[in-house]
Each structure stands twice: as structure tokens, then as C-alpha cells.
């Protein structure tokens, strides 16, 4: 049995960048001291650069039963080795959880961090006044060349401008545990 060192996100890269993965891990085998720099370089080349080139971000929000929600898409505002921010424009409806009507010209900034257990959505008026924040609690976020993916844990935290944060939908999380969709430990 042979054990070989791997770079971070090995299985993800196997599906999206197998040649780059193979080259990086060959280098790692010869130079284990370069692991951190290899991790950073491959992440930059295979995840962040394609996102920056495209300029668009797609957020895949998967429900615990396996059913994906309609992907949220927006324009990339910024990215760094830890994550990214993208902007969405709204025109109608109500803000999820905040129960506030959407006005024309309102926009949202979504902050995504690789490996984070939450995704932060901040909503603003067209005049840049904060409406509120919506924190989606989820499995650790995985970044891809097109955007991000995570499993929604159904419980969220909302915070209207000037108010304290509030936990919502806790009963959905309890039901998921009771039905065996997610573990009690999770």
C-alpha cells in the first residue's frame, strides 16, 4: 500500500482540473514543503481566475432532500484566496426572511467564503441604505470556477437594519434531524 500526499480540495479538482491536480501532486511528492504554496496556486488558477475572467457568479443552493433551488446569479465584485463577493439587482417581491418589500433598484451583496458554514446576504436600497442581512446556515461552502455550492441546513439568521439578529426556521432544522436527513451532530 502506498500513501501519497494530496493538495487541499483534491476530490473537487479531480472533477474540474485533473491535469493540474496531477501536476501539482507530482510536485508535492518531490517537494512536500511546497504544499501551502501549491494549494494557493491551484486554487487561484482553477477557481478564482475563471471566476474573475467570467465576471459572473452562480450560487448553487441545495436543499437537504437533494433538490436544488433555482441558482442565484450575480456580478462578481471582488475575490481573494478566502472567498468572493457578488452583486445582484432586484425589482420585485419580498426579501427572504426579512419580510420587507423589494423596491426597484434595490440590490444585494452576497459574501461567500470557502469552507464557511454560512453565506451572508446584505440588502440595500438603490440609495445604498442598508435594509438588512440574511445569513444562510449551511454545510461548508465549496467554491468552483463558476461560483459556489452548499447544502442548506434550513435554519437562518436575519437582521433588519438597526435591529438585533434573529434565528428563524429552527423548526425546519429539528424536523430534518428527526427525519434522519441530517445528523444530530451536524
What are these regions (language model features)?
Residues 151-186:
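A hydrophobic, small-residue-rich beta->alpha segment in the mid-to-C-terminal subdomain
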Residues 67, 96, 144-145, 168, ...:
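Short helix/loop capping segments that flank catalytic or ligand/cofactor-binding pockets
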Residues 91-93, 139, 171-175:
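Short, solvent-exposed aromatic-acidic interface loops
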Residues 5-105:
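Charge-rich, low-complexity N-terminal segments
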Residues 1-2:
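Mixed-charge, low-complexity intrinsically disordered regions
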Residues 79-81, 125-128, 159-164:
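Short acidic-glycine loop/turn motifs at beta-strand connectors
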Amino acid at each position: 500500500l502506498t500513501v501519497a500526499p494530496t493538495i487541499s480540495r483534491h476530490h473537487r479538482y479531480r472533477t474540474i482540473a485533473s491535469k493540474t491536480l496531477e501536476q501539482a501532486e507530482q510536485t508535492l511528492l518531490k517537494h512536500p514543503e511546497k504544499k501551502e504554496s501549491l494549494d494557493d496556486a491551484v486554487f487561484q488558477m482553477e477557481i478564482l481566475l475563471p471566476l474573475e475572467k467570467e465576471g459572473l457568479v452562480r450560487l448553487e443552493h441545495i436543499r437537504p432532500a437533494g433538490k436544488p433551488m433555482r441558482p442565484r446569479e450575480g456580478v462578481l465584485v471582488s475575490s481573494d484566496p478566502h472567498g468572493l463577493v457578488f452583486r445582484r439587482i432586484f425589482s420585485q417581491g419580498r426579501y427572504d426572511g426579512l419580510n420587507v418589500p423589494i423596491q426597484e433598484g434595490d440590490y444585494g451583496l452576497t459574501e461567500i467564503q470557502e469552507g464557511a458554514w454560512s453565506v451572508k446576504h446584505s440588502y440595500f436600497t438603490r440609495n445604498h441604505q442598508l435594509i438588512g442581512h440574511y445569513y444562510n446556515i449551511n454545510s461548508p461552502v465549496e467554491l468552483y470556477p463558476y461560483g459556489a455550492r452548499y447544502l442548506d441546513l434550513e435554519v437562518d439568521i436575519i437582521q433588519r437594519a438597526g435591529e438585533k439578529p434573529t434565528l428563524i426556521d429552527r423548526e425546519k432544522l429539528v424536523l430534518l434531524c428527526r427525519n434522519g436527513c441530517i445528523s444530530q451532530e451536524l
